């Protein structure tokens, strides 16, 4: 039985005629922005930067979050520290950021703690001493067993600072999952971490990233030299230095092994090719993490979004594409083709559309170019229900109580017989996991309501912001995966007027 501290207060829904409405109110009033009034929040086509590294505000609500609690913790899972394990160049940072993005999407208050960030901060403060970064690269700092006593003390200081911040996150920020991103390559150190967090009533889950595919490893090492450590380095010098880091750790590194120390762990081989699990309780949240790891891939490609033509039709209408629609999709095709180096649409591009006739016909030009085209019913636009075609004034007159609720929470609210953005987010989750599994560029041709949901995932948006973002029909939105964050670019479509 849940306590008052675990579960939000509930009340009966008061939206008459909404046959798909749930029977309880699952959101604390404090978790919804009081200022989220459409009259005071003009929609904008200004897209924010990736928010994955930003600390979550207390009132943050995630797009696929099922409910809110006073404690901030979900699924009765308690506090968990995910401790990454792996040699340099094994994609730990990539994996930890991707996992953080997915967990936040689910509404789990998750923060990233990169040991490299703490090292860079501390060494920047000591540029005039023998502890500057150039000095670190010429001695034993990056070894698991440094011989220099100053280096040992510095590493201990940096780790203590990180651990203190993790504890603060749990105790003062309603945190639920902390992801500790570091090599953590010694069995003895991992046991100390387990015992320490256990004393604080924090569960540990160790995730080791192992790459034994030579081609994948080399690709990941090349990507690793783009880290902040090598911001102004020559690429060849950076590659040599990073390779030396790997060698400095290989001699001492100890894989997770149930015989050596029976820890709760997951070993991921080649980013989801094979998963080994040891001593885990298969609760809901752990199962979601395992399932995500089976789908996660090292990503360096792009996701493109284009509005479909004639997307202002009534929800139930499904006419064929018009001549104007054909002109529009040709311009989309040409603009996208011109953005590639060889000015051609790559055959590896995967195109997703809904199952509506006009979107199927719109994708034909890409199919003719050799692209893989997939039609997904989940990509059908938001169903406006009884609110379809009504002005704000008409909505206020006909559904006054519902209209007031919509103004205060446009993300979760449904009009009678309608869908909410939250419904779309839950419906699209399987496609998000499928998207995570792909290694090729993807073009999604969809209604603006669908694009908002995908954007919210890829840029770690707050749910309250999603209904307010506009994606003009004369732009293709390009979001590119990078190790540390996703980057957005707008490709303007010539010959299409801005709405």
Spans of model-derived segments:
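Glycine-rich phosphate-binding loop used to anchor ATP phosphates in small-molecule kinases
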Residues: 78, 122, 136-212, 439-440
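Charged, amphipathic alpha-helical linker segments immediately N-terminal to NTP-binding catalytic cores
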Residues: 2-60
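Acidic, low-complexity terminal tails and accessory targeting/binding regions
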Residues: 3-15, 53-73, 257-258, 274-302, ...
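Conserved substrate/cofactor phosphate-moiety recognition/catalytic segment
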Residues: 93-167, 384
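A glycine- and Lys/Arg-enriched "phosphate-lid" helix/loop adjacent to the NTP-binding pocket
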Residues: 141-150, 197-255
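Active-site-proximal alpha-helix that buttresses catalytic centers in soluble enzyme cores
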Residues: 52, 299-371, 398, 419-421, ...
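Small-molecule kinase domains that catalyze NTP-dependent phosphoryl transfer to phosphate-bearing small molecules
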Residues: 226-294
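Phosphate-handling substructures
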Residues: 130-143, 216-232, 312-314, 320, ...
